Regions:
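"A position-specific structural signal for the A-helix of alpha-solenoid helical repeats
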Residues: 28-31, 59-60, 97, 130-134, ...
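Structural signature of alpha-solenoid helical repeat junctions
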Residues: 53, 90, 123, 171, ...
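TPR/Sel1-like alpha-solenoid repeat signature
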Residues: 4, 95, 102, 114, ...
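Terminal, low-structured helical/coil segments at or just beyond the last alpha-helical repeat
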Residues: 325-361
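Short coil/turn linkers that connect adjacent helices within long alpha-helical scaffolds
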Residues: 84-86, 122-125, 169-170, 209-212, ...
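Residue at a conserved register position within TPR or TPR-like alpha-solenoid repeats
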Residues: 5, 33-36, 64-65, 102, ...
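Alpha-helical adaptor scaffolds
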Residues: 222-300
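Alpha-helical repeat scaffolds
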Residues: 9-22, 39-53, 71-85, 108-122, ...
Length: 361
């Protein structure tokens, strides 16, 4: 209910909920203060966050990034958890969050550097996998040299050495499958369709554990859909993704105390589905996916800007200028400082927005 009230910007309802929750976490109490712009109250909350030795600062940062789309404030909050007096797992989580926040800004170069910093921190494990997931995001312009390096890095990963966070359970049993999936999608990014298909074949042939059959199937289908969509085969990609319906065991959603990304959360499949629907001009269906498909995901902030851009383009194609302008405005703000390869999209969006808000002249 809190999440719904926040998404609807019903902060009176949020206040009412918090009044009934005597020990509400800092992150839940902080968000309405930031939303209202109360500078004095904001300073008090920042002081409280500074003195905590918990993950509340980075959880607050995620809320501020997701619900308020204020990436600068989110960064400031997350950096509080980098203080030397914080415990190593908290510092590592904050560093990884900052890497994903850079991706949300369209800044692969800064995100890549942040991942490198995380790799050198105490207790770091699995950072290579997180960075590989980041590099596969379809809307980013990742240099091929970086993708090639990351593919080699993933190829060298020992799938049986997942570190303490994945030392047992279903996630550990699926690490070999995740590795092959990432190798397939990274190969697709490089235009190496033969290798991408080969890795997908290996993934399908790999035995699975417990109740993870649908997870393995969906990883392989997503990899194949990625290849199809990159080759302009939207109908084929959509058909491949039809069985991918979120059959993810609860254990895989909650095996980490605090996650910056869910390795098996199917966000990539959802984004590919939305892209395929746009290509097929199934605009109503596409809009539904862009609006809601990433809600609740730890990586939701990363999908905000590309989601706004696609919604703007769809509304523009349908002649709905007011809605298109609103989404272009959000997109331009979120990616205004993106990496150079993405700036042409930002410039084009800014020009379209100017025409829409200037009476079409």
């Amino acid at each position: 209910m809190w999440d719904l009230a926040v998404r609807e910007e019903d902060y009176s309802a949020v206040d009412a909920m918090l009044s009934r929750y005597a020990r509400a976490p800092l992150s839940m109490r902080l968000l309405p203060v930031f939303a209202r712009g109360d500078s004095a109250a904001r300073a008090r909350f920042i002081e409280e966050a500074t003195n905590l030795d918990s993950r509340q600062s980075q959880i607050s940062a995620r809320y501020v990034a997701t619900f308020l789309e204020d990436f600068a404030a989110a960064e400031s909050l997350a950096r509080l958890d980098l203080a030397e007096r914080r415990r190593p797992p908290i510092r590592l989580g904050a560093q990884l969050f900052l890497a994903w926040l850079e991706l949300a800004r369209g800044r692969w170069s800064a995100a890549n550097a942040a991942f490198e910093t995380a790799k050198r921190m105490e207790g770091a494990s699995g950072v290579e996998i997180e960075r590989a997931i980041a590099a596969t995001m379809p809307f980013l312009e990742v240099p091929k040299a970086d993708i090639g390096h990351i593919r080699l890095e993933v190829a060298r990963v020992n799938p049986n050495d997942g570190g303490p966070a994945a030392s047992s359970g279903l996630a550990a049993g699926l690490r070999p499958h995740l590795r092959l999936y990432l190798l397939s999608v990274l190969s697709s990014r490089l235009g190496d369709d033969q290798a991408a298909a080969r890795y997908a074949d290996e993934l399908e042939a790999l035995p699975t554990v417990d109740n993870a059959g649908p997870v393995k199937r969906d990883l392989a289908l997503t990899a194949r859909a990625d290849i199809a969509l990159r080759n302009g085969k939207a109908a084929e990609a959509l058909a491949l993704l039809q069985p991918v319906q979120g059959e993810v065991p609860l254990e895989l959603a909650y095996y980490k105390v605090f996650a910056t990304v869910r390795e098996f959360g199917q966000e990539h499949a959802r984004y590919l589905r939305a892209e395929a629907l746009v290509s097929l001009r199934r605009y109503d269906d596409a809009l539904r996916w862009y609006r809601t498909a990433f809600q609740g995901s730890p990586a939701e902030p990363v999908y905000l800007a590309p989601g706004h851009l696609r919604q703007a383009q769809v509304y523009e194609a349908r002649g709905e200028r007011e809605q298109a302008a609103a989404h272009y405005r959000h997109f331009v703000e979120l990616w205004k400082d993106s990496d150079p390869p993405l700036r042409a999209m930002v410039t084009e969006a800014r020009e379209k927005l100017a025409r829409m808000t200037d009476g079409g002249r």
